[in-house]
């Protein structure tokens, strides 16, 4: 049983987050180890394993990047934890330029405003790539979706770096 089946959801990138959450809470209640306190040791162990499976599946499905990676893995394309280098030099150049721009924000005349504008630009880029990966997955364009997910991971890392700069500026 795959993660989507576990939650009674269609195996697709786009999903209803509130339905996922409610299914998660329902499964948590049903398979909570406390419910099996008087059961046999084997049944208690199975309940603990099922609860762990539910938690792992939920963590994967609730995040767009890990959900896309999971869908790709289901199709035999494993990119989770891979060390493959990005093959798109234009994208890599853009990422380097964005990181340089982020480094220069602290020295700007209005760093908070500059960071807000920069964050908006990167968030827009992230949303565009998410929309593209959804289309690619829906159309079974697995290699294209895998490349897009790799790019999304770069952008997500940049978003985390923005948060660190924001913490420094406001901290």
What do the predicted segments below correspond to?
Residues 1-171:
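C-terminal accessory/regulatory regions appended to core domains
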């Amino acid at each position: 049983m795959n993660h989507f089946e576990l939650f009674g959801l269609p195996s697709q990138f786009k999903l209803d987050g509130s339905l996922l959450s409610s299914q998660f809470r329902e499964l948590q209640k049903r398979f909570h180890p406390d419910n099996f306190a008087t059961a046999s040791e084997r049944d208690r162990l199975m309940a603990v394993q099922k609860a762990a499976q539910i938690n792992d599946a939920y963590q994967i499905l609730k995040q767009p990047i890990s959900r896309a990676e999971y869908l790709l893995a289901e199709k035999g394309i494993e990119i989770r934890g891979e060390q493959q280098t990005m093959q798109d030099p234009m994208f890599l150049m853009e990422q380097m330029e964005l990181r340089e721009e982020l480094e220069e924000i602290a020295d700007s005349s209005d760093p908070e405003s500059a960071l807000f504008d920069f964050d908006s630009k990167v968030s827009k880029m992230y949303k565009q790539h998410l929309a593209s990966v959804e289309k690619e997955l829906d159309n079974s364009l697995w290699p294209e979706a895998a490349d897009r997910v790799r790019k999304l991971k770069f952008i997500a890392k940049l978003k985390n770096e923005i948060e660190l700069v924001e913490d420094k500026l406001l901290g």
